Regions:
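Short loop/turn segments that flank or connect secondary-structure elements
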Residues: 1-43, 47-243
Length: 243
């Protein structure tokens, strides 16, 4: 899926970077423009959990109603994104120009116009333990709202209750970085039928297998670590045992 926004970020990441004390000008006028012509609103497991809670439905039902699932072309990870609607590619959670889950909106929406990422060397991703990671912030192109307010990156994140060193975000990025190269190795080792089963288990454990009445993060850590250990175990098996 070649979304131009994601391609722009990949090609211009360094020039878009901002320090936590850097300032930017932006004022949200609640015009809803950032909720249309969007194909890049990816849902993390925490996003799915919070949205399902807000709408009082299971994670499975939320994904079935509002999302699309696919395999990342390069990461080979199961990915969940909000499924845009209609010719204007409207976010499915936009109703009467308002977000249906405003207080539980995906982190990528809450942070706009900021974005965040970590960068991990491919060699490090192959290791059992990753080196310490640092969250890097970027300013996305702004084509909505106005520029009547000035904010620092730090203040903007704090206003939405997003930690600068977000424990969950770091764990999720670490999980992706550890799973992705191992999935790619297994794709060379196993047949398509078995890979489909492995990906299905990962998708369920990472995105769906949660009790909404219990704190999310401990459940996520258990599920994420279980997926990593599963892939390590399968990779360690002789080919004939893994099949």
């Amino acid at each position: 899926m070649g979304d131009p926004r994601l391609q722009h970020i990949a090609e211009n990441f360094d020039s878009m970077k901002r320090d936590i004390n850097d300032t930017f000008r932006f004022h949200c006028t609640q015009c809803g423009k950032c909720c249309i012509n969007r194909e890049d609103i990816l849902m993390s497991p925490q996003d799915v959990f919070k949205a399902a809670q807000a709408l009082q439905m299971t994670p499975h039902d939320f994904v079935q109603l509002y999302c699309e699932c696919y395999l990342g072309s390069s990461s080979r990870m199961p990915i969940v994104r909000l499924q845009p609607r209609g010719s204007i590619k409207r976010c499915p959670l936009l109703k009467d120009r308002k977000c249906m889950i405003h207080d539980a909106k995906p982190a990528v929406c809450a942070m706009f116009p900021l974005g965040r990422a970590i960068r991990i060397d491919k060699e490090d991703a192959e290791k059992d333990e990753l080196p310490p990671m640092k969250v890097e912030y970027i300013i996305n192109p702004i084509d909505c709202g106005d520029f009547s307010e000035t904010h620092t990156v730090r203040d903007w994140l704090e206003s939405f209750g997003i930690p600068l060193e977000d424990e969950y975000f770091l764990k999720w990025q670490k999980t992706i970085s550890m799973l992705s190269p191992r999935i790619q190795k297994l794709e060379k080792k196993l047949d398509d039928n078995l890979m489909d089963k492995i990906i299905s288990v990962m998708y369920i454990k990472l995105y769906l297998d949660y009790d909404l009445g219990i704190d999310f993060y401990p459940q996520f850590v258990k599920n994420a670590d279980g997926c990593v250990e599963m892939l390590k175990m399968i990779l360690a098996m002789p080919n004939e045992e893994a099949v």
